[in-house]
């Protein structure tokens, strides 16, 4: 695949997207990755479609409505068999209006088309995987799909909506001993380029490291 990848690879970075509300340790991964690949890439500043934030905030509502549809034969008829977390999600689906769901679907289409247009300028987009280096289990359980989960979803939910392929690449260990990673996003149905770009970054970042547990 690498032989088919034209170099230098054009990598898009929205510096506001990768810094605002993001832990410095997570942003540092982006700087380190760019330094590691060196002349193999050309970094181009881009602007993410601003609708990504609304999609991150309300991803839980879309997920909840679609989950409710999937469980229509069993919920609420067999609600006693459901755990509290799933009940919370299903009830969120019941409380989300059809108008709000339709609005999010329209926003999904807009974001998808605007993001796809960026790939006429760059080969891949580079971003953190999450706004912190690596969350603990407790942090993830506390965030769940609730209103305060948007920061955890800002680098994942928008692409879940749009259908763009993403790839997480290990990027070493941070000073606290936690694993680091970066994320690459490519045009729809361009997994070949995505995997080739991932191989380039993975090779440049060196051998896989494991945290001491």
Where are these regions (language model features)?
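Acyltransferase
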Residues: 24-47, 71-77, 101-122, 150
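Small-aliphatic-rich amphipathic alpha-helix that forms the alpha element of a beta-alpha
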Residues: 146-169
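Structural helix-boundary/capping segments
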Residues: 1-19, 31-36, 40, 96, ...
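Short, surface-exposed loop/helix-turn segments at secondary-structure junctions
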Residues: 102-103, 133-153
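Short helix-loop capping/hinge segments that flank enzyme active sites or metal/cofactor-binding pockets
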Residues: 3-10, 61-112, 116, 168-178
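Short glycine-/small-residue-rich Rossmann-like dinucleotide-binding loops
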Residues: 130
């Amino acid at each position: 695949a690498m032989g088919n990848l034209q170099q230098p690879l054009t990598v898009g970075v929205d510096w506001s997207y990768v810094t605002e509300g993001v832990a410095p340790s997570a942003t540092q991964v982006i700087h380190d990755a760019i330094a590691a690949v060196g002349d193999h890439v050309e970094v181009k500043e881009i602007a993410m479609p601003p609708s990504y934030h609304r999609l991150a905030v309300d991803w839980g509502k879309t997920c909840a409505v679609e989950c409710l549809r999937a469980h229509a034969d069993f919920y609420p008829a067999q609600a006693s068999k459901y755990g509290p977390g799933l009940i919370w999600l299903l009830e969120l689906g019941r409380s989300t209006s059809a108008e709000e769901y339709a609005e999010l679907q329209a926003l999904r289409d807009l974001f998808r088309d605007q993001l796809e247009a960026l790939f006429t300028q760059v080969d891949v987009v580079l971003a953190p995987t999450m706004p912190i280096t690596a969350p603990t289990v407790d942090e993830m359980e506390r965030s769940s799909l609730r209103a305060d989960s948007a920061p955890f979803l800002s680098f994942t939910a928008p692409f879940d909506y749009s259908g763009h392929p993403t790839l997480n690449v290990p990027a070493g260990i941070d000073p606290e001993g936690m694993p680091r990673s970066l994320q690459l996003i490519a045009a729809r149905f361009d997994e070949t380029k995505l995997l080739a770009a991932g191989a380039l970054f993975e090779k440049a970042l060196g051998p896989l490291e494991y945290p001491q547990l």
